Amino acid sequence: RGQVFVQGLFQMHADGTGQTEFYGNNSWFPTALLHARGIPKSQEVVAVFSGHHTLQVGKLGIINPARGRQENQGARLIAPVRETAAERIDAYGQEGELFAYPYPLSAAEFLVSYTPDGWAVDPAFFKLYWFHADGRRELLASDPDISCHQAIPLVPRATPPERQSTLDPTQHTGGFALQDGYAGP
């Protein structure tokens, strides 16, 4: 595969075992998934759909691997929710409004850095918003001199469940399994 379309999401257990694809390992779309965070009480993640050779901004979307793990099968743009075509564009998501650093509060509500003007203003100037998946939004914070990025609520969040490690720390070798070297696009 080429150097451009290799920006899928991987997952693993806390002890480093079980490394596997979460989404898009054999996909051209989305080109890159940035700032991905798990949505509480679901198997979905919210992320910025972007390009490879771009800045770390793009379109706001949700990845649901239960609907599929390649191309646009489990990927949908939100704010507002809409059909999401699988586009092969290196600089994906760089036109119009721009999103960065989403933080899920629920399956439908997010804190996110956002600029409605996109690159029309240079440099792009981000403000902190509350967003609903349907596109409703409310400005929470802005600064006349700097962009607002990486919002994190100052309240406790439930600790995700962690499976017990199966590693034996006395061992110095391990095993590797390749399921099917011929599978893929």
Task: Set out the residue ranges of the language-model regions.
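Residue position within the beta-strands of beta-propeller blades
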Residues: 1, 44-48, 110-114, 160-163
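Residue-level signature of beta-propeller blades and closely related beta-rich strand-turn architectures
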Residues: 1, 49-52, 66, 116-117, ...
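Conserved beta-propeller blade repeats
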Residues: 1, 27-44, 88-105, 109, ...
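Structural motif
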Residues: 4-11, 54-64, 72, 120-129
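Short loop/turn segments immediately following beta-strands, especially the blade-tip
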Residues: 13-16, 62-78, 139
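Surface-exposed loop and turn segments in beta-propeller and other repeat-based domains
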Residues: 19-29, 69-93, 144-158
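Surface beta-strand/loop "capping" patches
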Residues: 86, 90, 97, 156-185
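Blade-level signature of beta-propeller repeat domains, shared across WD40, Kelch, NHL, RCC1
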Residues: 123-168
